[in-house]
From Swiss-Prot:
Function field: Heterodimeric geranyl(geranyl)-diphosphate (GPP) synthase small subunit. The small subunit alone is inactive in vitro while the large subunit GGPPS1 catalyzes mainly the production of geranygeranyl-diphosphate in vitro. Upon association of the two subunits, the product profile changes and the production of gerany-diphosphate is strongly increased.
Positions bound to Mg(2+) 2: 103, 109
Subcellular location, principal: plastid
Originating organism: Cannabis sativa (Hemp)
Stated name of the protein: Heterodimeric geranylgeranyl pyrophosphate synthase small subunit 2, chloroplastic
Gene Ontology molecular functions: metal ion binding; prenyltransferase activity
Tissue-wise expression: Mainly expressed in trichomes, and, to a lower extent, in roots, leaves, flowers and stems.
Bilayer topology: Peripheral membrane protein
Cofactor: Mg(2+)
Gene3D superfamilies: Farnesyl Diphosphate Synthase (1.10.600.10)
InterPro entries in UniProt: Isoprenoid_synthase_dom_sf, Polyprenyl_synt
Subcellular compartments: Plastid, Chloroplast thylakoid membrane
CDD domains: Trans_IPPS
Cofactor binding annotation: Binds 2 Mg(2+) ions per subunit.
Amino acid sequence: MSSNFLHMPMTITMSSQNFQHHDHSSYFASITKDIEAHLKQSIIVKPPFTVYEPMYNLAFTTPPTSAPLLCVAACELVGGHRRQAVAAASSLHLMHVASFTHEHLPLTDRSNPNPMIHHAYNPNIELLIPDAIVPFGCELLTRLDNPIEDDHADRVLKVIVEITRAFGSQGIIDGQFHEKVVNRSNGEEENNNADWIDYTCRKKEGKLYACAATCGAILGGANEEEEEKLSKFGLYVGMIQGYSKIGRGKEEERLKRVEELTKLAIKELEHFKGRRVEEISSIILGP
């Protein structure tokens, strides 16, 4: 299994007596293996090689997110089977790849470029290939065929809507805009603005993880209340991820906010007492 494909979530011990956490790395490792296998089976390097070769490489070299793992865990939490969510998890990863690649284009007009990102391809390739990855990610969902479930097509359609909304102008793109453009125009003062940081984390990582949890719930056959609970759980987990990536600002305030979000996330899982909440709750403070 590729070591840089998907990070394993860290496990933590919660103060709440309702949740006792153990090492569930093997659980997430098995999910990672299934997602990776699905991607390798789906993305075949074939003509035109100028499209599929960089698409394949970007899919397996882009710094990963644990959101796809959350998608599968949410599906299993509500009683679904992993096979129902692996394609959606793979699609989420590809959408993340496209978004990440576009966000880190080596543009010369950026005031604060990121020197840590390795660029294997020219900017024109990194600009165009993600535009091919996005529809391909949606195509993975449409290939699913599950005659056992009468409403399977409806579930897939709902998932496609969730994913496109999360990565669109009301979600991650909006967060990227505020992080890059607004930050550049307002200077360092905005970097330490609590409202700005919270908004960015909510729109970027928050929307991604909320989408992942919601998609897993939908495919697993959750009811509306379960979908809402897991969507909120994903939102809080994603925002925690966002705050963990911020290496500047007031450390004490950030830690306080993360603690608040952790409590909110745990509260949403109380609805699922008696189910396999340990696995999904261990993703709260992932990498």
